[in-house]
Each structure stands twice: as C-alpha cells, then as structure tokens.
Amino acid sequence: MTAQSQNIVETPSRVRAHALGVNAPELAKYQDEPAQMRSGAVGKSGYLKLRFAKREHRSILAEMERRVPSLVQKALYWDEEIPELPCVTMISTSGCILQGDRLATDVHVEAGACAHVTTQSATKVHMMNANYASQIQNFIVEEGGYLEFMPDPLIPHRNSRFITDTTISIHPTATAIYSEVLMSGRKYHHADERFGFDVYSSRVAAQNLAGKELFVEKYVLEPKVESLDAVGVMQTFDAFGNVILLTPKEHHDRILARVPAHFDIKGGIASGATRLPNDCGLVFKALGIDSAGVKAEIRQFWKIAREEILGVTLPEQFLWR
C-alpha cells in the first residue's frame, strides 16, 4: 500500500463512517454482517475528498481523492450566472447504497473560493437483510467562501437502514447552502414500499472554524415503530426537503421576507423557513406528495438566497432535471 493510499484509509471521516453505526441505539438490532461481503470491505468503503481554491479569474477543483464506489471526474463551469463557479457531480459506481456500505465525503472550500456539488441522479438505499449503511459528510468553508451542496433525493427501499452524519464548519463571513430530500420509498413499486424502510437516522451540525457549536439537528425515523403519517410529521405527504442556509446575519431578514409559510393540502405542498440558533443562518423545510413539488420549493428558496447574498439568480433549469 502506498503512503497516499494509507493516508486515505486513515482519513478521520472514513474512520468515523466505519464507526458511526456501531453504538447508535437505533441500529442496535442490525449489527449482523452480510453473508455476501463483510461491511466496509474493499468496494464498500467509499471516499471523496474535494478541495476548492480561488485562482485569478475563477475557483477550481484544486484537489480530489476518490475511492470506489464514490466517484468524481472533473469540475465543469455550466452555471452562466456565476461563470467562475466549479460544478462537481458525485457519482456512485455501484448504482445505489448497499448493506454494509461505509461512505465518507470531505469538501473543503478555501478562502474566497466557491463551489457547487450535486449528484447525477437520485440516491437509492437498497433493500437489506443484514447490517446497515452509514455516511459521514464533512464540509469546511473558509473566510468569504461560498458552497452549494444540492444533491438529488434519497430513496430508501423497504427494509433498508441508513444513518448519516453531517458536520459543516464555517467562517462567519462565509455562506453554505446544504440540501437534502428524503422520499417515502418506491411507493409505486410495491404496496409495502411506502415508508417500508426500517431506520433512517440523520444528524446535521454546524460549528465555526474554532469548533464552537452553532446548532445540531437530529431525527430518527422508524416507520415500523411509529407511523410517519401523523399530524406534525409527514401528514400523508411522501417527500421531505430540508435546507440549511448558513450565511451572515445581514442577509437573514431580507430572505425571510421573501419566503412566506405555504400550506396547501389540496395542492400537495407545505413549506416554510425560520431562523437557526446563534444567528448562524436559516432552515427551510418542505413537504410534498412527490419529489417534483419539493424540489421546486427548494429551488425557489435557493434562488432567493442567491439573489440576496450574491446578487445573482439561478440559471435556467436543465430540461432533464
């Protein structure tokens, strides 16, 4: 093993991905090893490292590391509203997340740099009969940096178990917009697919670059233990969008003034925004009957955030998105 490969194996985020679910109470019943291939084996321990840096006329993807099944090829510059913005698409060579997968991602935006990170399509968490899948995401945004992390929805198949932990370390002058969309499952595929997963556990936390905690949000969904169709949870909706916007306080009031609460049970959409603790930013949540409605609400919030923070809007949406 080369020194570089050894360093990647021992990367803190990757080590955390392997340890994340071991002591999680919600996964205590799912510690058995898969019969096919042990958890975290070669090909099941993915890693991505993306470091963005500012150069004279644009930001660039200055450093990249990748280990299967995680893959990134190169940065493209397709955002006509921000021509200097490197856009990177994360790819999975396995096509979905499988039992025993341990995934880790490190994204570092250096001072004054910008970046947009997305996925090529929805992420599917495959059916499981043993163990679980885990994911660590670690974001660092330095002074004056700007990061958009806007992946496509995650679709948990029935009997799947998935735990994810995200940490955003950010300078007070920087901006990060982090999005996640969770579907109820493949509701048109099988009668037991809608909320048929065993566990979905998500933790998102933010801190300043000195390590001072700004906020923590964690939720554990176990639809076979307690129905998610209750009022105050999903209330018959099938898609959940969660957007964290960390940005200087001077932008908060202007953004909130343009994002009124919206509840339309007949139209199948509900959304709203509020402030995060410690004046660190805003949180926007949306519920819908399908991913299209939730993605449209998120896109509108994203558009407003861009306009108020950067003074530019979003480009026209690609037809295939």
Curated annotation (Swiss-Prot):
Keywords: Chaperone, Cytoplasm, Nickel insertion. The keyword Zinc does not apply. Belongs to the UreD family. UreD, UreF and UreG form a complex that acts as a GTP-hydrolysis-dependent molecular chaperone, activating the urease apoprotein by helping to assemble the nickel containing metallocenter of UreC. The UreE protein probably delivers the nickel. It is found in: Cytoplasm. The keyword Chaperone applies. Required for maturation of urease via the functional incorporation of the urease nickel metallocenter. This is Urease accessory protein UreD. It comes from Yersinia pseudotuberculosis serotype O:1b (strain IP 31758). InterPro entries: UreD. One of its GO terms (molecular function) is nickel cation binding. One of its GO terms (cellular component) is cytoplasm. It holds the Pfam family UreD. It comes from the Bacteria.
